[in-house]
């Protein structure tokens, strides 16, 4: 088995072109890259966490966590939504995505984040600590999810004490006025 040595760092503005390249190559189109660029500039997404994975200096993966709140609540606990997670095709299956998730979760814990949500693959994210069916636990998604995909809306508590508050989750929406949706 080949051991690959990846490095991970919190991004800044100088990483913008590398983030765009990773997102575009991973998804095969620029829509996700455009969304990420907008979210990184959106005040309603803050505090955000953006991490880049590199292999021998080359950007190969990216993950973004943006602020989430309870709809209608001015003073929500610190929560985030993971979206998107991107790894360029030739580095998929090497553990880059999982390491980005774990590294991000550790940074979010240090920031005081209580919970992370994700809409993602129902068998992949539970391997990284996410619990399916967050809507059934009292945390409906910010957007409609068909019943057959409800297990894909997941959450992970980052504190020893689970949240006692429940409510409809709002996420940043850079296509709107910069307000949370």
Curated annotation (Swiss-Prot):
Alphabetical list of PROSITE patterns matching this protein: GNAT
Record's signal peptide: none
Protein EC: 2.3.1.-
Entry's Gene Ontology molecular function annotations: acyltransferase activity, transferring groups other than amino-acyl groups
Residue span(s) of domain N-acetyltransferase: 1-159
Keywords: Acyltransferase, Transferase
Keyword Phosphoprotein among record annotations: no
Pfam families named in the record: Acetyltransf_1
Similarity section: Belongs to the acetyltransferase family.
UniProt protein name: Uncharacterized N-acetyltransferase YjhQ
Organism annotation: Escherichia coli (strain K12)
